[in-house]
Design a protein with these regions (language model features):
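C-terminal substrate-recognition "lid" of short-chain dehydrogenase/reductases
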Residues: 84-85, 221-250, 255
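Substrate-binding pocket helix/loop in short-chain dehydrogenase/reductase
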Residues: 101-102, 106-114, 201, 213
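Short, small/polar-rich loop/turn modules that mediate ligand/substrate recognition or access, typified
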Residues: 91, 182, 187, 243-245
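Active-site helix of classical SDR
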Residues: 125, 166, 174
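Residue(s) in the substrate-gating loop at a strand-loop-helix junction
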Residues: 150
């Protein structure tokens, strides 16, 4: 593919890089010239993606990362810095869902969703920003943090309230962090994808209900991962120097 924005001389850390969007972004960023650090609990999967990147001539490192555990996050950033230097492009992508009506979802399921999708984003973004600020991002203006939200944060529906609320929360968190770090050279933005066929969806879109949902979209299709590529590269690049505190809905018109 043609790379619209270069990430040469950048080091990117992708949280939640073991599958789906995270693994896709890791390969994309490597193609754009970044050193890529893949963080996730499933290290066997991140190792496979890292090996694929290295075999293609890129630079990659797979590290264990549990976004609900601050010590794990710190260790992941330590490993990244030891290998490549300060991480200056961060993607907060880790996320889980516990589908079900709100009256049926168990408390531990709710806590897991909030812990991963909201607290995890907070902790990863905070650790990255701390290190960027300590490395003089104020002068360099090189900090880029991209949060992966969801169009569910802007819609109402049945059966996934915890997930939708967590994504609405991180969108507002992103704006607040952007304001907090605006004079420190750290930009924070949120991308809201539409429905994409990934592991988090399971086999939902093969069911009658899932097929009906797709049929209700204006273009009657799921979104392709690659439709996010240009925006993700842009927000992580030097070209996005003046973009912070923004939300971008990229959903193939699904929310219209």
């Amino acid at each position: 593919m043609q790379i619209p924005f270069s990430l040469a001389n950048r080091t990117a850390l992708i949280a939640g890089a073991s599958s789906g969007l995270g693994a896709h972004f890791a390969e994309l960023f490597a193609q754009a010239g970044a050193n890529v650090v893949l963080g996730a609990r499933r290290t066997d999967r991140t190792a496979e993606v890292a090996d694929k990147i290295i075999e293609a001539g890129g630079n990659a490192l797979a590290v264990p990362m549990d976004v609900t555990d601050e010590s794990s996050i710190i260790a992941a950033f330590d490993a990244a810095e030891s290998k490549f230097g300060v991480v200056d492009s961060i993607v907060c992508n880790a996320g889980i869902s516990v589908p079900g009506r709100s009256t049926d979802v168990p408390i531990d399921g709710l806590q897991n969703v909030i812990g991963t999708n909201f607290v995890g984003v907070y902790l990863v973004a905070r650790e990255g920003a701390k290190r960027l600020i300590a490395s003089d991002s104020r002068a360099k203006e090189n900090g880029r943090i991209t949060i992966i939200g969801s169009i569910t944060s802007r819609l109402t529906g049945e059966g996934d309230s915890a997930y939708a609320a967590s994504k609405a929360g991180v969108a507002h968190l992103g704006r607040n962090l952007a304001r907090e770090w605006v004079r420190q050279g750290v930009n924070v933005n949120t991308v809201h994808p539409g429905y994409i066929a990934t592991e988090i969806q399971g086999d939902w879109f093969q069911t009658e209900g899932g097929k009906n949902q797709i049929a209700a979209f204006p273009r009657r299709r799921l979104q392709e991962m690659s439709s996010l590529d240009a925006m993700m590269l842009y927000l992580s690049s030097d070209a996005a120097n003046s973009v912070t505190g923004s939300e971008f809905v990229i959903d193939d018109g699904q929310s219209l």
